[in-house]
Amino acid sequence: MWGIHHARLHTTLKTQQWLPLGSRILIALSGGQDSVCLTRLLLDLQPHWQWSLVAVHCDHRWRADSTANANFVQQLAQKWHLPCEVVSAPDLPKTEAAARSWRYQVFESVAKALDCTHVVTAHTQSDRAESLLLHLLRGTSPDGLATLLPSRSLGAIQLVRPLLGMTRAQTAAFCQAYGLPIWQDETNHNLEYRRNRLRLELIPYLQQHFNPNVEEALAQTAELLASDRAYFEAEVERLAPTVLREHPPALDRLRLREFPLALQRRLIQCFLRQHLKRGLNFRVIEAVRALMTTGNGSQTASLPGGQHLRVCGRWIELVRPMPPPPAPVPPDPGERSPPPSPLY
């Protein structure tokens, strides 16, 4: 098979070199329209690129039909002569975030076990637009809006998302045009999930009343922000050694004042990420920025973990809470207490 989407993906891969000639590639295959579309495209392009392709299916065990879904994927892979691994979750993931984290752990471990250099997922332009909106509505930084990068590292493996140039409507049309079987996941229509409500209600509303090409517009915004993020990350990596002190942890507030506001915030964020496991937000970053111009001895309110930041000369130092005193050691029952001293 060869059509317009084959040609576009072939051209994109030649330009970007995301999946080099002869790569061994692990395909995340859920059985839905997006992953079936991606798998068929890669199989059709395989003779041109000499890839070695294998698939993995993650069974979260959330749904009563999850075993039937896994069997469907295995049968489809067998029909297409595609080796396929099915991995079932040992425990039911409690949240969507936990499920996502488990999936990516599976992708990395299976890729390593099968000597794959790349993992591909079937995220589309529609997914990228939805992710940007979700992050925006929740509240995030510009970096948080630069969502679903086309390529990033997954440990020693490279994760690639080749379908970010296609919408979900286009993957559906592709599957229909080529008569490809797809698994219908009923949970995709459950409005208890925020992403489903956004996909089924908000995006169509925006398309009807504001911009029929809103998915493309939002995805382009994410792409622009991604290039900005790459630039700022490189700048922060270059400048951090001139601003951050490791022992004891501190920020050089005089040096920090020399930089534009965008770099100040990112350098502070870089510092705090090294020392805070949670609770990093806009309010905390602005509280640290306020210490750039306050008097000696000024300090922030308590941060997560009981830590706080305090001005000491030119430095904004991280102050950790004092460890509790060690518990007294009980006397050995076998030992006798010394006799009391005589009173004189």
Swiss-Prot record:
Pfam families: ATP_bind_3, TilS
This protein's UniProt keywords: ATP-binding, Cytoplasm, Ligase, Nucleotide-binding, tRNA processing
Subcellular locations according to the entry: Cytoplasm
Enzyme class: ligase
Domain of life: Bacteria
Catalytically driven reaction(s): cytidine(34) in tRNA(Ile2) + L-lysine + ATP = lysidine(34) in tRNA(Ile2) + AMP + diphosphate + H(+)
EC number(s) on file: 6.3.4.19
CC annotations in GO: cytoplasm
Residues involved in ATP binding: 30-35
Domain statement: The N-terminal region contains the highly conserved SGGXDS motif, predicted to be a P-loop motif involved in ATP binding.
InterPro entries: Rossmann-like_a/b/a_fold, TilS/TtcA_N, tRNA_Ile_lys_synt, tRNA_Ile_lys_synt_N, tRNA_Ile_lys_synt_subst-bd
Chain's role: Ligates lysine onto the cytidine present at position 34 of the AUA codon-specific tRNA(Ile) that contains the anticodon CAU, in an ATP-dependent manner. Cytidine is converted to lysidine, thus changing the amino acid specificity of the tRNA from methionine to isoleucine.
Organism, scientific name: Thermosynechococcus vestitus (strain NIES-2133 / IAM M-273 / BP-1)
Family: Belongs to the tRNA(Ile)-lysidine synthase family.
MF-aspect GO terms: ATP binding; tRNA(Ile)-lysidine synthase activity
Protein name, entry field: tRNA(Ile)-lysidine synthase
SUPFAM superfamilies xrefs: Adenine nucleotide alpha hydrolases-like (SSF52402), MesJ substrate recognition domain-like (SSF82829)
Region (Disordered): 323-344
Lineage: Bacteria, Bacillati, Cyanobacteriota, Cyanophyceae, Acaryochloridales
One of the protein's GO biological processes: tRNA modification
Major place of residence: cytoplasm
Coiled-coil intervals, chain numbering: none
Signal peptide per UniProt: none
